[in-house]
């Protein structure tokens, strides 16, 4: 740890690591596999960046978003660390420089997405590169996105083996015990060092309100915003069209806002994010495409205009408020329990469930005609990921699979946890802590169940 502290002080200016960082740094530096569940702002990046500078070889950092990797690389280069990233939005000259640096072993840290890692030009160059370790940042994307629209996540365990089985560190801010087990199994972690910090945020007051009409939902958002005229926040919706419509309505009402979703071009997304971070926009109206890795301490509130699909996503998103330790609020607007007066949440759930069922039906059809062994086929990427999720397929290499005998696959049923959370009479934080494996915890004293107040 002495060498690690020297690097920390020389480059980052800190005399010692935070208590939660020390076991991670020790494990990474000693070549152990690691699974770390740390709240955002817990210093996870430094925990793997410092060890990457203590030994030769390249540390591959697999991260989901271009903005994340570019931000990290810019910070490292300002410290004169040999770091680079690879993604499809780069100019030809920048990409060429990054690729050349792989072959010469120039990079101490190389940031890239799963898709870029497994692309032919990058994969070919990595074969001759000494890989010191791999890092999977935002590891919850493996369980949350890997079998929906980022199927290459499911090939990362095989990629690791093909690269000589370097130590692997997986970091995330939220993961249930079941998801932690899946991450370990799918990545092939061997006797990992596990560090799990409870996601409890004592300064974050959680509120849930029943909505009985679509008009009431709009009014509730307007009233909440009017009560916080000079504060920064985020409004989350489930659909792209919904974000555009609501942002337009609120902008016409005089609010400094715009929409954000994955369907926007890269320039538009970065402009919206930059304007919000700089304070030119009071808030963004966004889908779940926004927020991962964004460290904005000034966020005072988060609104969910609809019930989110899962508690992992919900906890990730409300955790973007109050990172400075000051009081913050998370407001969830849920359709009334019957779904008859306000069917919004029920209709959204049916829409996404139908899409999911269609994906499973496609996977079942693919299974019936796949050979027992075969090569990766891009047109079947999602079906292959679903089969891997259900233990019907193993990746022998990142580009070759083998089917395994197992009972017929069935779509996993969505757990009732989100609706249980909305309807619970317990302290909201007590419910969340239990759902994430934290056991008994005292009431928070701040949520709507503890205070009897919904809106303040």
Language-model-detected regions and their locations in the chain:
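Conserved interdomain hinge at the start of the Helicase C-terminal
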Residues: 207-238, 244-249
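Conserved helicase motor
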Residues: 86-95, 114-119, 198, 237-241, ...
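C-terminal helicase lobe
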Residues: 232-236, 240-244, 248, 252-262, ...
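Post-DEXD/H (motif II) to motif III coupling segment of the RecA-like Helicase ATP-binding lobe
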Residues: 128, 132-133, 140-196
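Conserved pre-motif I regulatory segment
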Residues: 1-37
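Conserved nucleic-acid-binding Ia/Ib motif block in the N-terminal RecA-like helicase ATPase lobe
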Residues: 60-61, 66-112, 194-195, 256-260
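Walker A/P-loop
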Residues: 31-50
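Conserved helix/coil segment N-terminal to the catalytic DExD/H
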Residues: 42, 91-133, 143-147
């Amino acid at each position: 740890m002495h060498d690690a502290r020297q690097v920390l002080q020389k480059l980052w200016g800190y005399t010692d690591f935070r208590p939660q960082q020390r076991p991670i740094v020790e494990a990474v530096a000693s070549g152990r596999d690691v699974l770390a569940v740390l709240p955002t702002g817990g210093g996870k990046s430094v925990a793997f960046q410092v060890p990457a500078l203590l030994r030769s070889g390249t540390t591959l950092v697999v991260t989901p978003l271009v903005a994340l990797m570019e931000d990290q690389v810019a910070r490292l280069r300002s410290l004169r660390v040999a770091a680079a990233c690879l993604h499809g939005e780069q100019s030809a000259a920048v990409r060429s420089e990054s690729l050349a640096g792989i072959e010469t072993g120039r990079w101490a840290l190389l940031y890239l997405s799963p898709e870029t890692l497994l692309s032919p030009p990058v994969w070919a160059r990595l074969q001759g590169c000494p890989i010191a370790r791999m890092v999977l940042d935002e590891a919850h994307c493996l369980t949350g996105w890997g079998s929906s629209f980022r199927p290459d996540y499911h090939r990362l365990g095989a990629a690791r083996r093909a690269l000589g089985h370097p130590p692997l560190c997986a970091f995330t801010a939220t993961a249930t015990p079941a998801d932690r087990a899946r991450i370990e199994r799918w990545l092939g972690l061997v006797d990992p060092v596990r560090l799990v910090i409870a996601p409890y945020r004592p300064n974050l007051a959680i509120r849930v309100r029943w909505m009985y009409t679509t008009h009431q939902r709009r009014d509730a958002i307007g009233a909440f915003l009017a009560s916080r005229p000079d504060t920064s926040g985020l409004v989350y919706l489930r659909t792209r069209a919904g974000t555009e419509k609501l942002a337009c309505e609120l902008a016409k009402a005089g609010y400094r806002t715009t929409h954000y979703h994955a369907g926007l071009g890269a320039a538009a997304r970065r402009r919206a994010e930059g304007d919000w971070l700089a304070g030119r926009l009071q808030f963004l109206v966004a889908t779940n495409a926004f927020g991962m890795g964004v460290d904005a301490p000034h966020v005072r509130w988060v609104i969910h205009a609809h019930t989110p699909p899962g508690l992992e996503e919900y906890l990730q998103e409300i955790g973007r408020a109050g990172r400075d330790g000051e009081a913050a609020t998370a407001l969830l607007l849920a359709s009334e329990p019957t779904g008859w007066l306000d069917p919004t949440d029920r209709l959204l759930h049916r829409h996404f469930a139908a899409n999911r069922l269609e994906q499973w039906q496609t996977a079942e059809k693919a299974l019936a005609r796949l050979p027992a062994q075969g090569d990766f086929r891009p047109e079947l990427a999602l079906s292959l990921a679903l089969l891997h999720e259900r233990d019907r397929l193993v990746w022998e290499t990142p580009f070759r699979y083998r089917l395994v005998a197992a009972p017929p696959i069935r779509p996993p049923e969505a757990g009732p946890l989100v609706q249980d959370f909305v309807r619970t009479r317990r302290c909201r934080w007590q419910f969340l802590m239990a759902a994430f494996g934290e056991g008994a915890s005292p009431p928070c004293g701040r949520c709507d169940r503890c205070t009897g107040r919904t809106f303040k």
